[in-house]
A protein has these predicted regions:
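Alpha-helical scaffolding within the catalytic cores
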Residues: 16-21, 112-116, 180-188, 223-228, ...
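Boundary/entry segment of secreted carbohydrate-active catalytic domains
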Residues: 1-26
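Conserved, mostly hydrophobic/aromatic
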Residues: 25, 33, 128, 197, ...
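Substrate-binding cleft and catalytic face of glycoside hydrolase catalytic domains
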Residues: 28-47, 61-108, 112-145
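Aromatic-rich peripheral "rim/lid" segments of glycoside hydrolase catalytic domains that contact
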Residues: 277-291, 295, 299-319
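Aromatic- and acid-rich polysaccharide-binding/catalytic face
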Residues: 115-134, 140, 179, 183-219, ...
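A solvent-exposed, charged loop/short amphipathic helix patch at secondary-structure junctions
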Residues: 43-50, 96-101, 144-150, 211-215, ...
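Aromatic-lined carbohydrate-recognition surfaces of secreted/lumenal glycan-active proteins
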Residues: 75-83, 127-137, 152-186, 236-250, ...
Length: 319
């Protein structure tokens, strides 16, 4: 299946393109599509989280896209995400983050997830994914983008457990938790409350720009055994991989160069500043995915694969 890229790029006109995009996904052999309905933080003090007109999909928009996905024999999954009117790293840094602020934040975020969980239930979505990386400062032992503590309350684990239980009271289907493969997993108390783990995967597969397909497949297996298997063994939960390797030189080694600096993969997506120095390489992207698929095929404990970053309005290659 695929995960659509929606955050910061959604427009109501997507409904015009969605059906053709879903046809393409189905024709490629996809069975699932992940939608990421968003709400926007419009203020830091107090934190206000609401759907922004024209930038966040309304419930009707998400419902219509799920129906179009179903019409193309695709299971719909919701991965609720947040955005802000500025970079989220700046938003978190500038927020007050005292006790009353955190209480307000969790209240607003709970309302957001309750809304999305109810929508998932009403539309018959196959699953809902929690654990949006953009709210990582609110996770237990959360940090800001500079690595400093976010000041999240000491009872953060209990707050997230309660939040998961709230979602489950609205939605009776499968709940997954997103974990970045490069980060430490959340506490067991959180993972024990969900059904499976959605492992966000952009792990380097080569130590150099010179690519060796066989060596990449071996490295992919080594990384899966080191990062994914321990999650399965410690939680007893299945793992779904969310693969993200852009079509740019350096993607397989984890460093797409632009002006001699490694660019974050998300900065290669539409509506971000152009990266003219990044070199297009569809071949490298293909080799990275082939290496991962070869490794996954030898590991039955991986229960699914999704390709992240599909852009519905047009067939694009990364900048």
């Amino acid at each position: 299946g695929v995960e659509l890229y929606q955050r910061d790029v959604y427009r109501p006109s997507w409904l015009t393109y969605a059906n053709e995009g879903f046809k393409t996904i189905h024709n490629l052999g996809g069975k699932q599509v992940v939608l990421s309905p968003t709400w926007t933080f419009t203020r830091e003090m107090p934190p206000i989280l609401l759907p922004a007109a024209g930038k966040d999909p309304l419930a009707f928009d998400t419902f219509a896209m799920l129906q179009q996905a179903k019409a193309n024999q695709l299971e719909g999954i919701l991965f609720p995400r947040v955005r802000a009117n500025k970079s989220l790293s700046k938003w978190w840094t500038e927020a007050k983050r005292d006790d009353s602020w955190w209480q307000s934040w969790f209240d607003r975020y709970t309302e957001f997830l309750q809304h999305q969980a109810a929508l998932a239930q009403q539309t018959g979505a196959a699953a809902i994914i929690l654990g949006d990386p953009e709210v990582a400062p609110a996770f237990p032992a959360g940090t800001l983008s500079d690595g400093s503590p976010s000041g999240v309350p000491a009872d953060a684990v209990a707050r997230w457990v309660n939040l998961i239980d709230q979602v489950r009271s609205f939605y009776k289907g499968e709940i997954l938790w997103a974990v970045n493969a490069s980060d430490s997993p959340p506490p067991q108390e959180i993972l024990s409350r969900v059904d499976r783990i959605y492992l966000l995967w952009s792990v380097p597969l080569s130590a150099s720009m010179e690519l060796d397909p066989a060596a990449m497949a071996v490295e992919a297996g080594h990384q899966l055994d080191g990062k994914a298997l321990p999650l399965v063994q410690s939680t007893g939960k299945g793992v779904v991989l969310g693969l993200e390797y852009p079509s740019a030189q350096g993607a397989a080694s984890g460093c797409v160069l632009a002006k001699d600096v490694c660019v974050r993969f998300e900065n290669l997506y539409p509506f971000h500043a152009d990266q003219p120095d990044a070199v297009l390489s569809l071949d490298e992207q293909t080799q990275a995915y082939n290496a991962m698929l070869a490794a996954v095929n030898q590991r039955e404990w991986i229960t699914g694969i999704l390709s992240r970053g599909f852009f519905v309005p047009a067939l694009l290659v990364d900048k």
